[in-house]
């Protein structure tokens, strides 16, 4: 799945036709993500005037589902949980969100309190879909890695904060 000129396309790896999932002139669809089970594509769309999260069956046989997002802002980096039940994304206000795809309920599981250049949260899912790891800036201006429970939002800093720690990856 790719984004080009505000449209979302699926392109087969081997044979088949390129398909425009959005075909929405005058709107901007961006940041597509394919679910790990291969059944769904998600992306952000402003066709309604405010950005919404769209979840669409990759086969295009059912209408896309638009999910209203909490606050008018810009959203980034959608990532499906490994079990394809949740989406992780960030926003302009440096919040880390987890959304249950079935219910459309989203909650903030973390944030970076400092609006500074090179602000990156770099969230990532644990292989069992239970935890989210991300970088957050401390009062010292170093970044630390925090893990948050995807269901409860309970957080724990796992690096000491004595040096920058960024881009968490799970083993």
Sequence positions of predicted segments:
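Short loop/turn segments that connect beta-strands within beta-propeller blades
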Residues: 13-16, 57-61, 100-104, 149-153
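Alpha-solenoid helical-repeat scaffolds
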Residues: 1-20, 28, 42-43, 49-51
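Residue-level detector of conserved, well-ordered beta-strand and adjacent loop positions
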Residues: 22, 54, 68-69, 110-111, ...
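A structural motif specific to WD40 beta-propellers
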Residues: 19, 64-65, 107, 156
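A generic structural motif
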Residues: 11, 44-46, 56-58, 99, ...
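Conserved beta-propeller blade repeats
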Residues: 1, 25-44, 65-90, 96, ...
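Structural motif
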Residues: 9, 49-54, 95-97, 141-146
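Surface-exposed loop/turn positions within WD40 beta-propeller blades
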Residues: 5-6, 15, 50, 93, ...
